[in-house]
Design a protein with these regions (language model features):
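A short, structured loop/turn motif at beta-sheet edges
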Residues: 16-17, 71-77, 99-109, 148
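Short, well-ordered strand-loop elements centered on a beta-strand within folded domains, enriched
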Residues: 50, 80-83, 105-114
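Amphipathic hydrophobic-ligand
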Residues: 2, 90-97
Length: 152
């Protein structure tokens, strides 16, 4: 099995501080993928720190549990997480990194990578699935930011 990579680089129409706050809320991933994630369970000792784990339950194509660990971050710049243990996803050894930088006060450049070994599924389909999800998170973040500001 070869390691594969999914990558998305795009400009997101939200301030960097907003993007970072939402991304770093490791326990709140369901708010960014509400139609994909059925539930997220957090251990009692969760502190949103490096090494913390979230249990994500999917309900669409890949139904089941994904256990993710927050591996590291540099405040307002970079975050890394990985899938640990068994997963309902068609991958092994998944590690993701997200880098962000401000382009101006209202826009953020996002560089999102996922590295993994694909299981039995079509490799290109798996790469595309992760790209789709990275883009969906960015799209949802833009929509939620716009919606929250239109209510003011």
């Amino acid at each position: 099995m070869l390691f594969l990579q999914s990558h998305v680089n795009r400009i997101v129409k939200v301030p960097k501080e907003y993007f970072w706050k939402r991304l770093r809320a490791f326990d709140k991933i369901q708010t960014l993928l509400p139609k994909t994630i059925k539930e997220v369970k957090i251990p009692d000792n969760f502190s949103n720190s490096i090494g913390d784990i979230r249990y994500v339950y999917l309900e669409k194509v890949y139904q089941g549990e994904v256990i993710e660990r927050l591996d590291g971050f540099i405040e307002e710049k970079y975050m890394s997480y990985s899938v640990i243990d068994k997963s309902c996803l068609p991958v092994e050894n998944y590690v993701s990194t997200v880098s962000i930088k401000k382009t101006n006060q209202d826009f953020t450049e996002v560089d999102w990578y996922g590295h993994f070994k694909a299981k039995d599924k079509d490799k290109e389909e798996t790469v595309s699935m992760f790209k789709f999800n990275y883009n969906l998170i960015c799209d949802n973040m833009e929509k939620q930011f716009t919606d929250s500001n239109s209510n003011i």
